[in-house]
């Protein structure tokens, strides 16, 4: 456990050597070693010392080094059988002896090192080789103890390089697992010594040494993922103290007591002026009284006493190394290495070097650090504490490296570093990037780059928001980051810089990350609801931090609480009482305040003014004292020394300088501290006295006005016998004294706002907080909290992006801005944030060329050539097409762009059409939509012909160039190219889709679009016409929900009609637009027929001049409407409008033909006659019959239409009779049909007086036909009397009058014909109705009326003569009538000869007409016979014959 646990023979870094070297064969190994022996001997022979001894050929004089090499040469070829079983020490040791010898020079030592390096890299021995561990150990030990004579600096550096080479090969070798923890520490120590010594050598050696060190760290920590945790890993001993940090308040840098980089120089340094120095890397023991510490000893001292260090390397050596790297940072601080101290090169100073090594370790170890508590603790405390300090360095290089480390820590260990990360963001990154604390531009840029790198991580902002902004104990890091980025993106009094672009990139990365997480389907509702009731907010916990179903509603709830807490804190800072009352009102504090709830409010709320809080806690009021004690109980002081606990306690508020308040505060603190840590102190009084003494010591040590400082002895003496009469341990008090002396207990006046500087007290609070904070929430790829975050960041992002977009010149920056704005548009639509989308549209529209004071020429050129204008235009219409559902007020700006494009004549011709749904769109129209091959621009065909105007643009100049009266220059090729490009841009924008696809818009957005079209139409007539066309197109495209917008559309069109006095294009479009809407929608919306047709009444409201101008076209459109939709119109209301329009055309010369065609289509053969439109059609037909516009045939046809309609009445009557069984209903329908018939009779009667003979006579004939058609109709009996009274009798009277008046003007023949027809009409009508009316009481009156009119006709003279035809016809008709009456029993002889009986009355009138008729109808014989048969005096008169 705790050591490397690889699969057999595997190592993560061995692949490098496998690629470069192949393992030698058994024979080759011996040959290779033999070669290396020869090489070493050859170099030795070149040396005078070794050469003389060799020449002497005296075995006794041969040196042991040479002898051992020769002996090895004798043996190697005998080992060829299996090198795996040969102890490596046998063939390694002779080379190591050369390395260890202090008699060899640098060249010899270098060759020996090369030989060892070759043996290691060629894998002569592996883990399976016997005694491999001992072999690896002696190699490391020998190289560490390398001795040689220095002859020249170059050879010395070569040896140092080869030392590094061999040590690195040891770690990279397959046999590296044979190294112990001690060996690894030795290797690292040795390399560090070379690194330091290289500072006085060449730059090449410096680079190689540092590179080797990085490689070592990478190799070592790359094994961390394969190492299992130790059972007792937390108990691993590290020589240096862990987590004990002293602070220098003056420099702001940490001090360290466990190392000094200068000691390395003292230990490893050689006299450069003395070339005879024998050792470059001497091993020297340092005495303690020299107060110098060698780096190697730091690691080795801890290793010597532990058996774990002798085991195969694993966690123990990694803990030592990582702790040492953290220590190196402390050493750097003590050595005061900063941007102003540059011993070699600034980028290679100790802190930067240490940070680079740490970064390498974290990169390779990655998430595996969390499996090892000791390493994790080093990161959480030591490392982060140093990072907080070096983050405030003036060096951009150091800050950059620190930020890289933090990024790696975030990516790999963020779940274990929640509070530390929050502190780094707040105290370092945000503070530096804010540029208000003396940071240089380079520092700000580095900090900004780090923030942007973090924002580019997919889950960063979501996790920051969930873990910090939604935690009441943490600051709002997400809001701070977004605000900072948005502010830094704004150029202030200067040009756009890289910083602005960088900040903008961070903002855009945030919104693009959100946009990538959202799905295609829109959420139903993502707005959380919270129950408003009192709850102890500090006790709210999540059941499962790993399940979004639990933590998402939890963090939203906490965020809701936090918002109210922040408001409460703000009010508390201004007025504590009002603040507490507010918190009670929002249910965060109970209705009756209790000390615990107020104390928890103080403890867990961010943003409180520490001064106000300190005054409250120090107040002598009893409730405040209770709150103070409850506040102290919220701290956990277990296992803390008193000084640390006091720092933590008083760091949460401002301790007042008033003695009584200090006393109360320290009393509460002491009571709590003693309760939890009663180990050394005997009672709480001792804790109180010591705490008070610490406060006094703090003032004494760090107050500038105190000249004589308290010494350690003074402090110890002052605290004698305070522990129940006994003294506290001297070591305990000494530790407290030095802690306070080196690091002040800072009680600054924190106002609760802004980014503060990290202090010792704050760091202690961070460590304390990290132990009790809630678990870190890891977010996945889902957009759980994106709505909440987007609502915060959208406004600032739009504003910042717009400013950068306005000032940027590079196209890639412009594209980046557009990408960000489109991401915002996507999110706004996804979360239904219409106001955000509207703001975005407004911002983008400002960058189009349509809102600038440009001429038409300039606008087209800008659109065609300027990238900013082009991108903005494309983005506006992309948003309108893709996210139009969620645009409200933004439609106004979009339509202004469309109107501007229309004025520039670069819109597609079909922009305002609904061609996709129009079945009658002609081929020619479709051809117009195709782009012309001619590059010369042509004015849109959709422009109204009645509105000729001269364009000021070069398009207009081109068209007008053909006019001989005007001479204007033709547009240049550049202008034409710009126009062509602009037209292509507009085409790619698919502006027509906005209106054609409006049928997919949500109701609210559609209504906003319609309203915007109406509002945009008031600027000029051309714009009004274009907007009206668009409005009509939108209406037609939304036929399935026409009621949603129709009232608004109709009101607008009605206003146009009523306010227009003369013909113009606008009113023309309005009228025919309504007709088109009705034509297109009636087939699909039968339930809206009445509503649509009612709208046509606006045509009736046209001014006379306007109506006259368009009457013919109106009639033609009505014909189309009727022919296409007659079967869909069922109600009287709908037909009333149609018939009214047709009736108007009857007297219009051009329109009457089309109007009558429509009427004939409706009435012919009763095709579309209905009870609901019957009377209306009769009236219209009457208008056409009476109208003298057109030929006589049209009037006759109109009369025929009326008379033929009687068959429809007969059919309806028969259908009613067959389908209705209820008598009442049948009677009602009969009455309605009767009324229609009577209406028919009356309307025909009116035409019977027409001045035109053909029309008049034909009308009488058709009236007779209509009356005759009543046989098939169930007419109520009283209706016949109405027919005679209101039609027949009046007709005869009027005809007679008409004939008399016109007898002088017309031929007697035509007058007689009319009288004859009228007489026949009355006679036939009477006979037809006789059966139905003879039994009615009014029959006698009607009969007398008939006789009177016959008598009048007989006696009337025309031009002094009676009409022969009339006088011949009437007796015949009367005779026929009397015979019918006789046959039917209506007229019978009466025996009341002297009375006024029906019989007598009849003959009284008949005899005046023709005296002979009585004898012809009733011969005397029949009369006598009738009287004899019925002579009974008592019989009453025949019924019905009374007058």
From Swiss-Prot:
GO MF annotation: an example: guanyl-nucleotide exchange factor activity
Biased composition regions of type Polar residues, renumbered to the chain: 939-949
Residues in SEC7 domain copies: 554-743
Catalytic residues as annotated in Swiss-Prot or TrEMBL: 658
Pfam families: Sec7, Sec7-like_HUS, TPR_28
Topology in membrane: Peripheral membrane protein
Residue stretches spanning the membrane: none
SUPFAM superfamilies per record: Sec7 domain
Biased composition range(s): Basic and acidic residues: 1425-1435
Protein name, UniProt field: ARF guanine-nucleotide exchange factor GNL1
Protein species of origin: Arabidopsis thaliana (Mouse-ear cress)
């Amino acid at each position: 456990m705790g050591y490397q646990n690889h699969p057999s023979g595997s190592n993560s870094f061995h692949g490098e050597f496998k690629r470069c070297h192949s393992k030698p064969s058994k024979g080759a190994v011996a040959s290779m070693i033999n070669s290396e022996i020869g090489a070493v001997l050859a170099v030795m022979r070149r040396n005078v010392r070794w050469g003389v001894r060799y020449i002497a050929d005296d075995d006794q004089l041969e040196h042991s080094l040479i002898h051992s090499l020769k002996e090895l040469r004798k043996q190697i070829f005998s080992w060829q059988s299996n090198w795996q079983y040969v102890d490596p020490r046998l063939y390694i040791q002779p080379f190591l002896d050369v390395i260890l010898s202090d008699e060899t020079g640098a060249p010899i030592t270098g060759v020996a090192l090369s030989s060892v390096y070759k043996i290691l890299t060629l894998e002569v021995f592996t883990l399976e080789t016997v005694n491999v561990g001992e072999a690896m150990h002696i190699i490391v030990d020998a190289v560490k103890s390398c001795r040689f004579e220095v002859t020249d600096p170059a050879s010395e550096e070569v040896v140092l390089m080869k030392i590094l080479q061999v040590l690195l090969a040891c770690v990279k070798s397959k046999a590296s697992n044979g190294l112990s923890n001690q060996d690894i520490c030795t290797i690292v120590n040795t390399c560090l010594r070379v690194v330091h010594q290289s500072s006085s050598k060449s730059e090449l050696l410096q680079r190689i040494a540092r590179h080797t060190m990085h490689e070592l760290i990478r190799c070592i920590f790359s094994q961390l993922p394969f190492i299992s945790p130790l059972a007792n890993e937390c108990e691993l001993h590290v020589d240096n103290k862990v987590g004990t940090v002293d602070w220098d308040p003056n420099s702001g840098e940490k001090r360290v007591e466990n190392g000094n980089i200068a000691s390395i120089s003292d230990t490893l340094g050689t006299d450069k002026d003395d070339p005879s120095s024998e050792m470059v890397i001497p091993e020297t023991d340092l005495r303690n009284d020299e107060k110098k510490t060698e780096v190697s000893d730091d690691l080795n001292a801890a290793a010597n006493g532990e058996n774990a260090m002798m085991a195969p390397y694993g966690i123990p050596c990694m803990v030592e190394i990582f702790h040492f790297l953290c220590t190196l940072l402390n050493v750097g601080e003590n050595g005061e290495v900063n941007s102003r101290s540059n011993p070699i090169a600034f980028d290679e100073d100790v802190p930067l070097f240490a940070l680079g090594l740490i970064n390498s370790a974290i990169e390779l170890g990655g998430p595996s650090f969390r499996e090892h508590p000791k390493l994790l603790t080093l990161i959480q405390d030591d490392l982060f504490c140093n990072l907080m300090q070096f983050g405030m360095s003036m060096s951009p290089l150091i800050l950059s490296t620190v930020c890289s480390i933090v990024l790696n820590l975030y990516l790999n260990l963020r779940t274990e570093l929640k509070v530390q990360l929050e502190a780094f963001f707040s105290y370092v990154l945000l503070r530096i990037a804010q540029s208000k604390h003396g940071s240089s531009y380079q520092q700000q840029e580095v900090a900004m780059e780090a923030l942007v790198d973090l924002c580019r991580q997919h889950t960063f902002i979501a996790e920051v928001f969930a873990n910090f902004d939604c935690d009441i104990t943490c600051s709002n890091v997400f809001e701070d980051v977004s605000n900072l980025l948005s502010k830094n993106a704004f150029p202030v009094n200067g040009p756009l810089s890289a910083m602005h672009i960088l900040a903008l990139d961070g903002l855009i990365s945030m919104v693009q990350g959100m946009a990538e997480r959202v799905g295609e389907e829109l959420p139903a509702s993502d707005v959380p609801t919270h129950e408003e009731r009192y709850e102890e907010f500090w006790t709210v916990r999540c059941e499962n931090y790993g399940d979004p179903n639990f933590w998402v509603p939890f963090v939203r709830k906490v965020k809701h609480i936090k918002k109210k807490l922040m408001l409460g804190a703000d009010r508390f800072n201004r007025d504590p009482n009002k603040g507490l009352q507010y918190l009670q009102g929002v249910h965060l504090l109970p209705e009756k305040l209790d000390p615990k709830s107020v104390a928890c409010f103080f403890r867990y709320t961010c943003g409180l003014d520490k001064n106000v809080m300190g005054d409250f806690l120090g107040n002598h009021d009893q409730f405040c004292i209770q709150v103070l004690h409850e506040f102290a109980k919220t701290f956990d002081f277990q296992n803390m020394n008193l000084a640390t606990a006091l720092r933590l306690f008083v760091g949460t508020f401002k301790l007042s300088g008033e003695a009584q308040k200090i006393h109360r505060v320290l009393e509460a603190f002491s009571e709590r501290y003693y309760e939890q840590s009663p180990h050394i102190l005997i009672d709480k009084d001792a804790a109180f006295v010591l705490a008070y003494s610490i406060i006094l010591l703090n003032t004494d040590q760090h107050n500038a006005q105190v000249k004589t400082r308290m010494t350690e002895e003074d402090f110890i003496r002052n605290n004698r016998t305070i522990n129940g009469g006994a003294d506290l341990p001297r070591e305990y008090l000494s530790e407290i004294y030095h802690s306070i002396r080196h690091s002040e207990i800072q009680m600054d006046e924190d106002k609760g706002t802004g980014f503060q500087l990290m202090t010792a007290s704050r760091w202690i609070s961070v460590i304390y907080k990290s132990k009790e904070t809630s678990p870190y929430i890891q977010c996945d790829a889902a957009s759980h909290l994106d709505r909440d975050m987007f609502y915060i960041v959208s406004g600032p992002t739009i504003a910042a992006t717009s400013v950068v977009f306005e000032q940027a010149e590079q196209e890639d920056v412009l594209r980046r801005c557009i990408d960000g704005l489109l991401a915002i548009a996507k999110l706004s639509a996804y979360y239904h944030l219409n106001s955000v989308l509207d703001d975005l549209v407004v911002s983008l529209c400002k960058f189009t060329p349509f809102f600038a004071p440009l001429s038409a020429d300039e606008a087209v050129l800008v659109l065609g050539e300027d990238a900013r204008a082009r991108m903005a235009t494309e983005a506006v219409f992309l948003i309108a097409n893709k996210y139009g559902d969620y645009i409200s007020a933004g439609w106004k700006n979009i339509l202004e762009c469309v109107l501007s494009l229309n004025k520039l004549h670069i819109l597609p011709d079909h922009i305002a059409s609904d061609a996709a749904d129009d079945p009658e769109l002609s081929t020619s129209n479709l051809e117009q939509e195709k782009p012309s091959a001619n590059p010369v621009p042509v004015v849109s065909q959709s422009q109204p012909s009645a509105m000729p105007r001269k364009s000021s643009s070069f398009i207009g100049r081109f068209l007008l160039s053909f006019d001989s009266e005007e001479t204007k220059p033709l547009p240049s090729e550049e202008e034409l190219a710009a126009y062509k490009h602009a037209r292509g841009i507009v085409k790619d924008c698919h502006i027509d889709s906005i209106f054609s696809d409006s049928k997919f818009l949500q109701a609210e957005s559609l209504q906003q679009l319609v309203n915007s079209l109406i509002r945009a139409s008031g600027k000029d007539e051309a714009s009004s016409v274009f907007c009206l066309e668009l409005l009509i197109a939108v209406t037609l495209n939304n036929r399935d929900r026409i009621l949603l917008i129709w009232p608004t559309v109709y009101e607008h069109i009605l206003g146009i009609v009523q306010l227009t006095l003369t013909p113009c294009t606008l009113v023309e479009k309005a009228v025919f637009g309504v007709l088109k809407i009705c034509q297109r929608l009636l087939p699909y919306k039968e339930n809206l027929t009445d509503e649509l047709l009612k709208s046509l009444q606006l045509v009736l409201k046209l001014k006379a001049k306007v109506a006259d101008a368009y009457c013919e076209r109106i009639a033609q459109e009505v014909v189309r409407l009727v022919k296409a939709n007659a079967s869909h119109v069922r109600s009287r209301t709908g037909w009333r409008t149609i018939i009214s329009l047709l009736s108007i055309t009857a007297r219009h010369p051009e329109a009457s033909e089309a109007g009558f065609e429509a009427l004939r289509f409706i009435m012919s053969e009763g095709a579309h006659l209905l009870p609901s439109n019957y009377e209306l059609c009769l009236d219209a037909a009457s208008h056409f019959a009476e109208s003298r516009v057109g030929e006589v045939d049209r009037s006759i046809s109109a009369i025929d239409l009326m008379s033929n309609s009687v068959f429809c009445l007969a059919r309806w009557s028969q259908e009613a009779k067959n389908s209705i069984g209820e008598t009442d209903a049948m009677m009602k329908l009969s009455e309605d049909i009767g009324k229609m018939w009577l209406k028919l009779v009356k309307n025909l009667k009116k035409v019977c007086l027409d001045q035109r003979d053909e029309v008049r006579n034909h009308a009488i004939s058709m009236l007779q036909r209509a009356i005759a058609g009543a046989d098939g109709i169930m007419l109520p009996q009283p209706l016949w009397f109405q027919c005679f009274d209101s039609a027949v009798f009046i007709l005869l009277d009027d005809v007679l009058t008409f004939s008399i008046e016109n007898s002088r003007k017309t031929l007697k023949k035509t007058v007689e014909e009319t009288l004859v027809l009228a007489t026949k009409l009355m006679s036939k009508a009477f006979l037809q109705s006789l059966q139905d009316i003879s039994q009615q009481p009014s029959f006698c009156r009607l009969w007398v009326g008939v006789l009177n009119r016959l008598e009048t006709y007989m006696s009337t003279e025309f031009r002094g003569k009676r009409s022969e035809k009339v006088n011949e016809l009437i007796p015949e008709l009367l005779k026929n009538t009397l015979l019918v009456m006789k046959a039917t029993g209506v007229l019978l002889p009466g025996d009341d000869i002297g009375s006024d009986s029906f019989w007598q009355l009849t003959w009284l009138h008949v005899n005046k007409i023709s005296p002979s008729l009585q004898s012809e109808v009733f011969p005397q014989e029949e009369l006598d016979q009738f009287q004899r048969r019925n002579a009974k005096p008592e019989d009453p008169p025949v019924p019905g014959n009374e007058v």
